[in-house]
Amino acid sequence: MALAIRSSLRAAAMGRKAFRQAVPVRVAPAQRVRSVTTASAEITAYSVEEKGPKDSLEYRMFFKQGAKEVSCWHEIPLYAGDGHLHYICEIPKETSAKMEVATDEPRTPIKQDVKKGKLRFYPYNINWNYGMLPQTWEDPGHTDATLGAAGDNDPVDVVEIGAAAAKRGGVYKVKPVGVLAMIDDGELDWKVIAISADDPKAALCNDVEDVEKHFPGEIQKVLEWFRDYKIPDGKPANKFGYDNKCMNKEFTLNVIKETHEAYVKLKSGARANSEELSLI
């Protein structure tokens, strides 16, 4: 009897083993992780935090590096290596809200410009990504010997002509290729022409003549846009130095170098902060 029971149990065990071998074990499929493609020119080490209602006088966009709040003007380096610069997008292409880095507020957040208590907008969309070069400053105490105009007390502006729309508050690598010397109400307001490092045409554009070849007529469009945008508000057209010419890359890099040096003097205290800008 005992022998029969043991034989029966042995047979049952062999049956279960055979069943496990015959039926494959089901493994739950790996969970899909949706990847997000980020432009290689975007510097993802920085993030932004928005405070206050959008489209309001209280709205501010602050920058963070990890958990730490940082100033996009002071703590993001100007030079990115390999001939590239960092720039901060304030106004994405095909938008009209006049956003700017608030250089007189702690941590220099992005805010919308205000005039007579009202938020400012361009009369029409800007057709390029527009922003600023960190760690640069156009010194209002320095008059350009050739142009006879002093700096406008702001970081240097960037007009990024690439195909893709940037995002407000994005930090990107760009290649500078030229510069326009805009004179706005008697103040010198350099407009650096640049292209995003990951634009399909970036490798082809290394100087002004390359831009004219691969983006024919684009620099003239930039000049005309900035020349005329105040006219709908009843103001005169802006002027440009050097006979409206876009200066070459060598000249551009010298402008960037000089405005970076002016910034360093301001930040270090070698130049008095008589404009009461925020240096934190």
UniProtKB/Swiss-Prot annotation:
Catalysed reaction, written as an equation: diphosphate + H2O = 2 phosphate + H(+)
Cellular component GO terms, alphabetical: chloroplast
Pfam families, per database record: Pyrophosphatase
Top-tier EC class: hydrolase
Domain of life: Eukaryota
pH dependence: Optimum pH is 7.5.
Location of the protein in the cell: Plastid, Chloroplast
Residues holding Mg(2+) 2: 157
Entry-linked InterPro entries: Pyrophosphatase, Pyrophosphatase_sf
Binding sites annotated in the UniProt record for Mg(2+) 1: 152, 157, 189
GO biological process: phosphate-containing compound metabolic process
CDD domains: pyrophosphatase
GO molecular function terms attached to this record: inorganic diphosphate phosphatase activity; magnesium ion binding
Keywords annotated in UniProt: Chloroplast, Hydrolase, Magnesium, Metal-binding, Plastid, Transit peptide
PROSITE patterns reported for this sequence: PPASE (PS00387)
EC assignment: 3.6.1.1
Cofactors (names): Mg(2+)
Modifications after synthesis and translation: The N-terminus is blocked.
Binding site for diphosphate: 120
Summary of subunit composition and partner proteins: Monomer.
Similarity remark: Belongs to the PPase family.
Descriptive protein name: Soluble inorganic pyrophosphatase 1, chloroplastic
Species lineage: Eukaryota, Viridiplantae, Chlorophyta, core chlorophytes, Chlorophyceae
Encoding gene, per UniProt annotation: ppa1
